[in-house]
Amino acid sequence: MNSKMLRSASPAGGGLFFCWWKRGGWKCGRVEVRIGIVEVNFMKSGKRPDPNVIHPIEGYDKEIYVKPTIQNPNILVGDFTYIADSDFESHVTHFYPWSRDKIIIGKFCQIAAGVEFVMNDANHQMNAVSTFPFYTLEGWEMEQPASSDMPFKGDTVIGNDVWIGQNAVVLPGVQIGDGAIIGANSVVGCDVAPYTIVIGNPANVLRKRFDDELIDLLLRFRWWDKSVAEIDSLIPILTCSDLERVREELKARL
């Protein structure tokens, strides 16, 4: 069916009031202009984004918000981070009740199918002649090595609004900054700076996403920490490809 649109002057406030036909029903919203960026405040049939629901797409179970599904107290995940799967914890490997590390993931991260987070207990002793883990397998006479003899890289920390591509592997102790992008099939063994794209095995820097000034503005603005209502109103800014307009808008709001 071809889309239909009605337009009328807004009775209150500036801009125009639109109604349009979509998926079997009329949708309405007010359009306003701020510093050249169109902002649309949608009336969403009474539904608000809820970080505590498991399935953000009704009737589709292959994409979930991660936070409400977590059982392991050493996995900490922020609001609205999702994975393209029906389960998250199976993607965190070598993570046992006695493990000393944590995995900490921020808000609004996008984790593609097949991504794996490898934790520190995947490591074997490397300062001896053999790396074979005799102490973990029944029948062998070996005590567990001292913690100082085992590689330990610390917690794995993923920032906010990070996109991790399909089948990427994040190794123990890696820290990935806000807004970074991890290319599909990458193996990330080193830290990734905010708003940086890395690809490959081992993952190497492809480029920064933005210039240093815009990165600094985004890190100070921290849109992911704002209320759902405010983030909703910021969507036209967050999805605007005119970076100079975005830059001026952020400066005006800081």
Where are these predicted regions, by residue range?
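Positively charged N-terminal leader segments that act as targeting/secretion signals
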Residues: 5-17
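Flexible, glycine/small-residue-enriched loop-and-beta-strand segment within the central core
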Residues: 65, 75, 82-172
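C-terminal segments of enzyme domains that contribute to small-molecule binding surfaces
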Residues: 44-50, 134-135, 141-170, 203-254
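Acidic, Ala/Val/Gly-enriched low-complexity intrinsically disordered segments
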Residues: 9-12, 31-33, 38-40
